[in-house]
Amino acid sequence: GLTGCLSFINLKFKGSKIHSSSSTCEDAINFINVSGQVSNIDVKNAYSDGLDVDFSNVYIDKIKISSAKNDCVDVSFGKYFFKELELFDCGDKALSIGEKSVLKLDKITIDNANIGIASKDSSIALAKIAKLKNLKTCLAAYNKKQEFSGGVIKIKDFECIIYDKKINFDFQSTISINNEL
C-alpha cells in the first residue's frame, strides 16, 4: 500500500510547491516514479519520514524539513539533484541515499540528527557544500543489503561541529572530503 500522507505516483512535475504539516503517516510526502522539477518542499512535524522518494529522476530547488521522527529525506533507486536542503531535528538520518541512487546537491545544512548524510547499497552522494552540527555521526557510508555493494560520499566543502563520530564507513564504501585532504 501507499505509505505517504501525500503520495505522488507516475507524475512529471514542473515548478510545484509542496507543504506538509503534522503528518501522521509513514512518509509525510512520498514520490514514486516521478520526474521533473519541484520548486519547494516544506515539511514540519512528520510522524516518521519527512520526504521519501523512490524510483524517480527529479530536480528540487529547495527542501526544508523540520522535525521528522525518522529520516528527514530518504531517496532510493533513482537520480536526484537537490539545490538546497535545510534539515533540522531528524530522528534518525537527516539525508539517506540508498539502493543504487545517485544524488547531487549544491548545499545542505543539517542540525540535530543521529546521522547527517548516509549513503548505502551502491549509492553515490556528491555535495558541493555541507554544513552539519549536533550529530552522533556526521557521515556514514556502508553496505546494508547483500545484493548491493557499499556507498560513496564525496563533498567539496565540508564542516561538521558538535558530533560523537565524524565519519563511519565499511570496507566496501568510501568517503572523500576535498577540503580535508
Regions found by a protein language model. Name each.
Residues G1-L181:
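Extracellular beta-rich repeat passengers
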